[in-house]
Amino acid sequence: MEKINKILQGTNSEYKSEWFVDGFDCFELFQQRHGYTYDDLIMLPGHINFSADDVSLKTKLTKNISLNAPLVSSPMDTVTEHLMAINMALLGGIGIIHYNNTVEEQVVEVKKVKRFKNGFITDPIVLSPTHKLSDVDMIKQKYGFSGIPITDTGRIGGKLVGIVTSRDTDFIKDRSTTLSEVMTTDLITGQQNCTLEEANSILKSCKKGKLPIVNDKGELVALASRDDLVKNRDFPMATKDHENKKLLVGAALGTRETDKERLAALSDAGVDVVILDSSQGDSTYQREMIRFIKRNYPKIDVIGGNVVTTSQCESLIQAGVDGLRVGMGVGSICTTQEVMACGRPQATAVFKCALYSSQYNVPIIADGGIRTIGHIIKGLSLGASSVMMGSMLAGTEEAPGDYFYKDGMRLKKYRGMGSLEAMVKGGDQRYFSETDKIKVAQGVSGSVVDKGSVKKFVPYLIQGIKHGLQDLGCNSVTNLRESVYGGKVRFEVRTAAAQVEGSVHSLFSYEKHFI
């Protein structure tokens, strides 16, 4: 009783330091051998001595590829084609083009991304003086631009003789007119050895839309575009390759022999990274494909998966992956855990796989179960270098598909690649079932509410992540990981009542706006 009175009066000198320890460190938490989801966990706030704008979200996608924002769009046929991939890269992340299509269709999608934003365009579309205005019209319809250099041969490397832009062609009715009659021949050019900064300076001063780059013989070797100056100004976080300053883009493929032909075509198109798209990545097929890619296409990074255990990680790391994709049966449209009785709660899977893979400097992508900004922050806190989003981005203007209305709501279709609908189109390769007479679905088809454009939605996510890291007292993704593994960031397990308390409650009605 005397001890209790001392505590109540604040005079007790026998306080024990362990009484004041808040929460668990990550190792204590996951030694309990429970399977945790993101919602099961909460992180405790840290000390703030910097602004949210000072938070750096620069991170690794693979061993060799960096992103300016830890966001990746999923290779699903209702999520990522060229529009999504372009905008994800402009905003600092990356898009992975799905492969529920023909090789030719996937290659076209990749090329559209790589052509969208360039430093020096080393493979510009070129025409000859004998081509017609109708040829320019076809190029504009297919690629969306009409500023075309003209060489005597109609190919890169030919002698530059002119350039054709919309100013030369807009008001000419006869589209059979040859380009020699309308092209501009009084040209301002850059020399082959000029830097990108010098080329941009010339574009600014001459107020032209295109700047042909020529060698000492006057032969066309490259092209610089004024449009790209504007894009650099409007999208300073854009993720680009180091060599040509083109937007980064990834593509998915399978592990069949026919996928080697797809890989060759994707390599020619300039893809930066490929994801081996399988619901269960620890297979002989995937290990062999990883070795094939690293042996024959050393400049292309390969991400393996999906995995959820350390033994799966070990298997693919030994095969030579540059990154891993973690998650099995946790997506909103995925039924793998329910149907196959196989998978793992995502928070536990991310922590275990990230901790193991960190020994080999192999980054992981937390794939699935992302419904809120909080889930993104938790995935990063548990060791993921980036997060992959499907349902979060489905329903945006840039996602494939058309909007439709139901019960007054504007919706877009969203389906799992393991749904019967997607399997019929080709997604069954992902589930090793393309030869099965009876298909067993591991996903569903549904719809999601219109979210507007990713040009507004993704910056909202990025700002939210920055504020979340600020609350934890971490000024970068790297600092976050160090603080988690060092025990500075503390965790607690939330009871069911705590989860209710931590979400919207006790209201008759409310509205929830993303932006």
Swiss-Prot record:
It is an enzyme of class 1 (oxidoreductase). Keywords: CBS domain, Cytoplasm, GMP biosynthesis, Metal-binding, NAD, Oxidoreductase, Potassium, Purine biosynthesis, Repeat. Induction: Down-regulated by Legionella pneumophila infection. NAD(+) binds at D277, S278, S279, G327, M328, G329. It comes from Dictyostelium discoideum. IMP binds at S332, D367, G368, G369, G390, S391, Y414, R415, G416, M417, G418, Q442. The active site is at C334, R430. This is Inosine-5'-monophosphate dehydrogenase. Catalyzes the conversion of inosine 5'-phosphate (IMP) to xanthosine 5'-phosphate (XMP), the first committed and rate-limiting step in the de novo synthesis of guanine nucleotides, and therefore plays an important role in the regulation of cell growth. GO terms for biological process: GMP biosynthetic process; GTP biosynthetic process. Pathway: Purine metabolism; XMP biosynthesis via de novo pathway; XMP from IMP: step 1/1. Mycophenolic acid (MPA) is a non-competitive inhibitor that prevents formation of the closed enzyme conformation by binding to the same site as the amobile flap. In contrast, mizoribine monophosphate (MZP) is a competitive inhibitor that induces the closed conformation. MPA is a potent inhibitor of mammalian IMPDHs but a poor inhibitor of the bacterial enzymes. MZP is a more potent inhibitor of bacterial IMPDH. Its main location: cytoplasm. The keyword GTP-binding does not apply. Gene3D superfamilies: Aldolase class I. Its EC number is 1.1.1.205. InterPro entries: Aldolase_TIM, CBS_dom, CBS_dom_sf, IMP_DH, IMP_DH/GMP_Rdtase_CS, IMP_DH_GMPRt.
